[in-house]
């Protein structure tokens, strides 16, 4: 769990921190030499691997846009903008730039100058909390409805932002959804360097996307260290085991070729009886070009999950509501051992090419090919009992389902970036083009399963062979062209983005001999304004739009004529305040937002078509604080309130919560007999969540508060012979609170719930060099 921390800066790690560069002109004539050395000294933050989308060399093209700290004090903006032809480079050690993000603008921009809500989750924070999954990583962020599949649904990253499910990006490229939702890639969080949550519509730069935002992840890539590495072993409750290794350095003496290899072997039982997960993953990467103007990074990944827990739940009656027999235990399993299978193989190869033409213009392009194969088979409960009133009895109705899906995904994104002046205005221009393509083969099967006696369960019953009923071949592609202009005048920053997308899909179903075609063209845009006062305050306002293709048939004349559904349209108005204490990484953000999603499909009873008249509103307020006032103290806090309503039903959007709150802090003793000992803890509170309509009425999940704790110790402080060794431990849900994480209630059609994660403790020992 502490492997990442051992290789980084914060929390008293021993390894080399990121490198910061000082550009200092060399002059040789007269009195100008001393003056120039004072005026033109500039320092900027480097964010490779710590931004979700920007590659290593992007920092060189964006440096004169960012302010920072120097060893001698604050740097004036004019000096940071000035360039001398002959410069000498001096390396300076510094801390990770947790106050810089790239997802909002596709360039490395300080959060204090970003007119949109972005939550940054650093590698150090993930290590301090003992994070094992992306769901766990985002739990302390404002606006997140976490663990929508409870504590057992860990095979996918399932959470909502501002009431909406959001897509996931890795290294700037989208993980494409599969037609069934089962052949979806998952990234092991230990190979991640950083996670950003971009909140609100982002289609103006990324194409089809959710109005809630997106999740941006960044891989660990080669750094400028000559040789480094670490090995970490972790064990814990539910028979957790994992071994992680991360090794990198220079492949050539001059550093023109660099490498990094990450690998893991891990597994554990889940909190449900008779289920478990295993994973094998390796990710090699190479960077060619060193610190030159042209660099190429190649990144590969192969991951095999022979099993990955259960995807089942528990009936609402017996979990959220008391049944005639009482309540089901949290380890209740609704499936059957002989029919439980989840097998996923995923492979990917990525390239990132960057070229710097000069100090003003650069070009970058990246692409990824994914190949994902999933075999899934399960027996699951139907959400009700086979009894007269549905609330008594103990025989749980069940069915069986299976699918085999194979997806091939291509994604590319290329962009030119440049800086120009028009009078007093400074422009940061970007022109981009991206392309996505997918082919998916899927076969689905269905069958009956015997009822399960919940008081005396038999998990080895005879399950009949499944009957295939659907076989799809789906092909889709999206082309997008976009542009952006960040205009700066004194302390005012205006940003405008616009994009045109062309989307097509063709789905053929071979059992029913049907064909579904979609073709859409959509323009999306964003405009924002921010003013950065010199005392650290930045008020801002922004407006952004999004679109999402939908599958379905629509009629506006009672079924006389039919057409394919148009994409849903999202729009958001957001305003807020950001404050960063000058010269520190202490950042406070507050934002209010109003989101509308229109063109939502509304089904018409007893017909095969829908009306495209649905409208969803999401209104809320968020506050976050991220502070590292000292190198050995890290504090994060968040509060959010939201109201998400589906106008077609007059009810809240299902699985949308009313808000959350959290606080986490980690402190490392800097001196004394306990030097190197770190300890911390956190609280995360979830307000009520709407779970749909049950047979008895509206379902509301009660609020709950959970507590986590972490400790760590650098053994070098015990003995110099233990240099590089570190031990750590963490506990989630410290007091083992019994709670329901989420429910899906559809009246007589089924009522399901999911227990939240039980108390889960783990400990690790690691060595780094």
Regions found by a protein language model. Name each.
Residues 266-270, 283-289, 293-356, 371-407, ...:
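Acidic/polar loop-and-plug regions of large Gram-negative outer-membrane beta-barrel proteins
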Residues 177, 190-193, 204-284, 290-294, ...:
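Outer-membrane beta-barrel translocator/receptor signature
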Residues 491, 594-596, 612-693, 766:
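Gram-negative outer-membrane beta-barrel transporters
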Residues 95-118, 123, 135-174, 193:
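Extracytoplasmic beta-strand/coil segments of soluble accessory domains associated
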Residues 158, 173-199, 218-219, 325:
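Short acidic/polar hinge/loop motifs at secondary-structure boundaries
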Residues 287-291, 407, 426-438, 472-597:
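Structural signature of Gram-negative outer-membrane beta-barrels, strongest in the C-terminal barrel
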Residues 429, 541, 573, 654-769:
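Conserved C-terminal beta-signal and adjacent last beta-strands/turns
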Residues 354-358, 362-368, 372-378, 539, ...:
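Membrane-embedded beta-barrel scaffold of Gram-negative outer-membrane proteins
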């Amino acid at each position: 769990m502490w492997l990442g921390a051992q290789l980084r800066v914060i929390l008293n790690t021993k390894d080399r921190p990121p490198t910061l560069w000082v550009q200092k002109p060399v002059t040789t004539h007269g009195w100008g030499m001393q003056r120039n050395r004072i005026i033109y000294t500039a320092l900027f933050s480097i964010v490779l691997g710590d931004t979700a989308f920007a590659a290593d060399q992007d920092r060189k093209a964006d440096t004169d846009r960012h302010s920072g700290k120097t060893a001698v004090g604050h740097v004036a903006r004019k000096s940071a903008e000035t360039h001398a032809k002959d410069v000498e480079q001096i390396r300076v050690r510094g801390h990770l730039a947790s106050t810089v993000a790239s997802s909002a603008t596709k360039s490395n921009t300080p959060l204090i100058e970003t007119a949109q809500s972005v939550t940054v989750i650093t590698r150090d924070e993930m290590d301090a909390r003992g994070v094992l999954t992306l769901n766990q990583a985002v739990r302390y962020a404002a606006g997140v409805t976490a663990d929508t599949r409870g504590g057992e649904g860990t095979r996918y990253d399932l959470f909502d932002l501002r009431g909406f499910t959001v897509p996931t990006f890795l290294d700037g490229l989208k993980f494409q959804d599969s037609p069934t939702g089962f052949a979806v890639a998952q990234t092991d969080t230990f190979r991640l360097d950083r996670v950003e949550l971009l909140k609100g519509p982002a289609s103006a730069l990324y194409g089809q996307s959710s109005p809630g935002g997106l999740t941006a992840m960044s891989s660990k890539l080669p750094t400028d260290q000559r040789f480094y590495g670490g090995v970490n072993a972790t064990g814990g409750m539910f028979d957790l085991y994992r071994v992680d290794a991360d090794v990198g350095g220079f492949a050539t003496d001059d550093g023109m070729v660099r490498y990094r290899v990450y690998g893991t072997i891990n597994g554990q039982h889940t909190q449900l009886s008779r289920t478990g997960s295993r994973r094998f993953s390796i990710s090699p990467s190479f960077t060619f070009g060193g610190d030159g103007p042209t660099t190429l990074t190649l990144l590969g990944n192969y991951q095999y999950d022979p099993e990955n827990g259960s995807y089942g739940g528990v009936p609402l009656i017996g979990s959220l509501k008391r049944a005639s027999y009482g309540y089901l235990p949290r380890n209740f399993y609704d499936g059957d051992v002989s029919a439980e299978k989840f097998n996923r193989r995923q492979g990917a190869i990525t390239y990132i090419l960057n070229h710097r033409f000069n100090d003003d213009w650069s070009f970058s392009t990246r692409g990824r090919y994914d190949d994902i194969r999933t075999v899934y088979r399960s027996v699951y409960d139907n959400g009700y009992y086979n009894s007269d009133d549905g609330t008594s009895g103990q025989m749980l109705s069940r069915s069986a389902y299976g699918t085999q899906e194979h997806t091939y995904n291509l994604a590319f994104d290329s962009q030119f970036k440049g800086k120009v002046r028009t009078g007093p205005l400074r422009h940061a221009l970007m022109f981009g083009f991206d392309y996505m393509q997918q082919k998916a083969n899927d076969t689905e099967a269905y069958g009956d399963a015997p009822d399960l006696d919940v008081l005396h369960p038999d998990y080895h019953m005879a399950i009949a062979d499944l009957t295939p009923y659907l076989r799809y071949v789906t092909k889709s592609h999206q082309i997008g062209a976009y542009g952006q202009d960040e205009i700066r005048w004194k302390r005012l920053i205006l940003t405008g983005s616009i994009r045109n997308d062309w989307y097509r899909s063709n789905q053929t179903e071979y059992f029913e001999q049907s064909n579904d075609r979609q073709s859409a063209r959509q323009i999306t845009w964003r405009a924002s304004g921010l003013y950065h006062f010199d005392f650290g305050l930045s008020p801002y306002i922004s407006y952004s739009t999004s679109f999402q293709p939908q599958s379905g048939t629509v009629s506006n004349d009672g079924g006389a004529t039919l057409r394919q559904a148009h994409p849903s349209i999202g729009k958001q108005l957001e305003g807020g305040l950001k404050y960063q204490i000058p010269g520190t990484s202490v950042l406070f953000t507050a934002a209010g937002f109003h989101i509308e999603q229109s063109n939502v499909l509304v089904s018409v009873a007893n017909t095969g078509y829908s009306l495209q008249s649905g409208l969803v509103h999401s209104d809320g307020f968020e506050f976050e604080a991220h502070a590292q006032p000292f190198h050995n103290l890290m504090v994060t806090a968040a509060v959010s309130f939201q109201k998400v309503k589906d106008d077609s039903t007059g009810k809240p959007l299902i699985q949308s919560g009313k808000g959350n709150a959290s606080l986490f802090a980690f402190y490392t003793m800097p001196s004394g007999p306990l030097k190197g000992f770190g300890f911390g803890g956190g609280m995360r509170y979830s307000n009520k969540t709407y779970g749909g309509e049950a047979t008895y009425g509206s379902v509301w999940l009660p609020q709950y508060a959970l507590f986590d704790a972490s400790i760590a110790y650098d053994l070098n402080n015990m003995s110099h012979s233990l240099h590089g060794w570190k031990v750590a431990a963490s506990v989630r849900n410290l007091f083992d609170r019994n709670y329901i994480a989420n429910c899906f209630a559809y009246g007589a059609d089924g009522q399901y719930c999911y227990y939240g994660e039980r108390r889960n403790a783990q400990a690790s020992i690691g060595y780094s060099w």
